[in-house]
A protein has these predicted regions:
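A short linear hydrophobic-aromatic micro-motif
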Residues: 53-57, 89-95
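Short, well-ordered beta-strand elements within core beta-sheets of diverse protein domains
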Residues: 25, 69-71, 106
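Predominant activation on well-ordered alpha-helical scaffold segments within soluble catalytic domains
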Residues: 14-22, 42-45, 79-82, 116-119
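Conserved PLP-binding catalytic core of the aspartate aminotransferase-like
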Residues: 54-85
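PLP-dependent enzyme catalytic core of the Aspartate aminotransferase-like
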Residues: 80, 87, 96-130
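Conserved PLP-dependent catalytic core of the aminotransferase class-I/II
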Residues: 22-57, 83
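Single conserved hydrophobic/aromatic residue that forms the stacking wall/gate
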Residues: 1-6, 10
Length: 130
């Protein structure tokens, strides 16, 4: 038999899953979340596809709705972007330590407005640094 301490781990996971499922239902269900995630990804990818400074690093047919990696092509400029973005309230944009660049994680809880604000910031950064 599991000790109560060991089973508490599972209880916590089930509790958190229940909270997430209720939130998803409140937001309109999976089909609504899928539409929201597609819209968020489109906003960001459309900007990256036309940007003179930022470039997506994944082929169009392989793109994720949740994690959007991108680069400037210059490691120093990438670092400057991450630093300025963090100061502006956009956190955890630094890419994987072995790959570099940046990565925007636009999971379910990220509102569309958050992605729009990120793109606005990226446009400003591009204007100042391209």
């Amino acid at each position: 038999a599991l000790s109560s301490a060991a089973s508490d781990v599972y209880k916590r996971q089930i509790y958190i899953c229940g909270k997430v499922f209720k939130w998803l239902k409140k937001m309109g269900g999976l089909s609504v979340m899928k539409e929201r995630n597609e819209e968020k990804a489109k906003i960001l990818y459309d900007f990256l596809d036309q940007s003179k400074l930022f470039k997506g690093t994944v082929r169009k047919e392989d793109r994720s709705l949740m994690n959007v990696p991108f680069v400037t092509g210059d490691a120093e400029l990438d670092a400057k972007f991450v630093k300025e973005a963090t100061a502006a309230g956009f956190v955890n944009l630094k890419g994987h330590r072995t790959v570099g660049g940046m990565r925007a994680s636009i999971y379910n809880a990220m509102p569309i407005e958050g992605v729009e604000k990120l793109v606005e910031f990226m446009k400003k950064f591009e204007k100042e640094n391209a």
